Amino acid sequence: MQKNSALWILRATDGCVSDLKYGSWTISSYEQEAATTLAAAGWSPITAAVLCSRGYDTPEKAQAFLSPDVPLSSPFALLDMEQAAARVKKALERREHICVFGDYDVDGITATCLLTDFLRKRGGHVTSYIPARLEEGYGLNEIAVRALHEQDVKLIITVDCGITANQEAALCRELGMELVITDHHECKSDLPEAVAVVDPHRKEQPEPILEMAGVGVAFKLAAALHGDQEALLAEYCDLLCLGTVADVMPLTGENRKMVWQGLQALANPKRVGIAALMAECGAMRPPITAGTIGYTLAPRINAAGRMGHVDIATELFLTNDAARAVSLASQLCKLNRKRQDVESGIYKQAVSMLPAGKSPKAIVLADETWHQGVVGIVASRLAEEYSCPTFLICLDGDKGKA
């Protein structure tokens, strides 16, 4: 990595850079002498200051931190990976109907597409399923489980969800279906009863915990079945990069390697869906950085789930038809423009509901016309603008959802 190109990846470690005019910011202290030494070694002064403030205060520490050339850990370092891989392998051998069940954000979509594509290329009879945000909500649910049972699905593999699906796991057993859970969210003390529960945050998981996105955990399952992680990374680093950056994972260790390789792949995309999306939204101009994902690609992919058309995004990443990909990319960008219009309308209405000339200590607003898939963005915007906790509630009869 060139030393003067390192700053973008440091910024991405903390997610998209916020507008500094809001809130109160405290700059971390650092040793000026150490920063001067790093600057003399070739880093820009601001990069040197950031590195020192994070404890990477020698050229050796800084280079080790920034280097994407790190070894990939064994997928079997994750608890229950052996059981998960064995059950999936059996399903492939028996030609059982498998469902990869994901989430409607970028991480969940890329995880779903990665594992679905991997299993189909190995002859799997695979259905992908992402719940409708407005009708089903987040994660594995009774409606979905029963629908999949009607389709004769024998094995459900969750990606980026499932770690709290205790009731749904019980329903799977009742219906004679088996469940493999892969997730990256925090675990409760009572895990769902499944064939395997693979999650870096399991309390019994040996240190160090892999802080990776749901797509990263899905990749580890594929790697356990494939055997050659480096070859698999070369094939799927584009999807890994999208999901990891969009989910604001720390860009350290394996995440840094995945994102670094992924950004190189995005500069010359081979997956027709990604190429079509980047062309449609004007993201092909170099340099391709984490900001390209955070500010340009991720909002458009997320729009599919927010606006209730997540199937457009999954088909886009799974299709091999270039003409179809162009059509899907166009649809996705139109959805994003619609999302922006809806968001703007809710924002203006919410601001008009606030008392003029006052600085609120908290904002709680509700309306029955607001779009549930978009209010979260508006709430975040208001919270940042007014520097206070903000709750926007979508009313539906006597119920409200935030």
Model regions: which residues?
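N-terminal amphipathic/basic leader segments beginning at the initiator methionine
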Residues: 1-31
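Hydrophobic helix-and-loop "lid/oligomerization" segment in the mid-to-C-terminal part
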Residues: 20, 28-155, 175-176, 226-402
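Short alpha-helices
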Residues: 114, 192-245
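Generic beta-sheet signal
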Residues: 129, 159, 182-184, 198-200, ...
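Short gly/pro/ser/thr-enriched loop/turn and capping motifs at secondary-structure boundaries
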Residues: 134-136, 165, 185-190, 204-206, ...
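Short beta-alpha junctions and helix-cap segments that line functional grooves
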Residues: 141-144, 165-169, 182-185, 376-379
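Phosphate/diphosphate-binding loops
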Residues: 155, 159-173, 178
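Short, acidic/small-residue loops that bind anionic groups at enzyme active sites
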Residues: 177-192, 389-390, 394
